[in-house]
Design a protein with these regions (language model features):
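Conserved ATP-binding/catalytic motifs of P-loop helicase motor domains
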Residues: 1-166
């Protein structure tokens, strides 16, 4: 564990899979993030431990980033700039955002974080396009690639059914 790095996720289940992981909401001290930017900032400033976390962390990892809304992304940027007293993007904090935007969407009908202008202007995206876990099973790789985009043809459906053990 390194105090300069915070490992967070958008859900509690995903956070348990990270070393010393917490939900982004818990780590950031933002609760449900209801209210405007100033209300959330006030909540963070009132908690010395949380405030110090924001001020000292150098790298913030956010897993399951596909569940992060554009609105929350922008609120967090505001909080980071104010608490860290730095007008750079996220107060100069480095972000490592992990996830697949074809998987879990933000809750409700909210916009994805990548739909924020702030995201588009400040985040470099890297597509990981090599499958390692199923590298010797090209048939299964093809099924996974199709399923990622919500496609399940008859041939693949039958193949998956044939692997059911009763």
């Amino acid at each position: 564990y390194n105090k300069g790095c915070a490992a967070t996720a958008m859900t509690g289940i995903a956070a348990t899979l990270l070393p010393f992981g917490k939900t982004l909401h818990s780590w950031g001290g933002i609760g449900l993030a209801k209210g405007d930017e100033e209300e959330i900032l006030s909540k963070v400033r009132r908690n010395k431990k949380i405030r110090e976390q924001w001020q000292t962390v150098e790298l913030l990892i956010i897993d399951e980033v596909s569940m992060l809304t554009a609105e929350l992304f922008e609120k967090l940027d505001y909080v980071a700039r104010k608490v860290r007293k730095c007008d750079k993007f996220f107060g100069g904090l480095q972000l490592l955002l992990c996830g697949d935007f074809c998987q879990l969407p933000p809750v409700g009908s909210s916009e994805y974080c990548f739909q924020s202008e702030l995201f588009m202007e400040n985040i470099d995206c890297y597509l990981l396009d090599k499958i390692f876990r199923q590298q010797h099973d090209t048939q299964f790789q093809n099924i996974l690639n199709d399923l990622r985009f919500g496609v399940l043809n008859t041939r693949n459906r039958e193949l998956l059914k044939s692997r059911i053990v009763t």
